[in-house]
């Protein structure tokens, strides 16, 4: 919907279908050039110089990982690792280091988010500036994306020889999966 501008969640959810599904790998990569810069600014705490909005929503980085996973399926895991491996590791480090302002990794392995004051998921309707459906806690789709990201990135880094990080991520996924 054009009236929403370029919202980060919508970008990453739709990117594989709009590009990879119609054999437009170059278009995917072109969009990711800008998206990667915006992600890096966000995780570095820098003000955004790109018109990709709502990057701070708790599920956005996980949707970015999912989009890159689709890229790996359509091209190759090796190509994904070469182009985006560092970005994927940096996203994972950002989340695991508890640097996100509204994404809290708890001891049970699940990610917790607070949506009391601001709509933070795809159910983002508001009335008088307040969420119609406030979503706070262990949001199911966020944690599904989290588990997926842990497993996908663990596999990629293991294939690249980083067995230590892969084992850490797999151990985290085991804890998350049991919760």
Language-model features: locations:
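Active-site flanking loop/helix segments enriched in acidic
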Residues: 1-2, 130
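Aromatic-rich carbohydrate-recognition surfaces in CAZymes
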Residues: 5, 9-11, 15-120, 139-143, ...
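Active-site oxyanion-binding pockets that recognize sulfate/phosphate
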Residues: 78, 136, 163
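A short, charged helix-loop
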Residues: 117-134
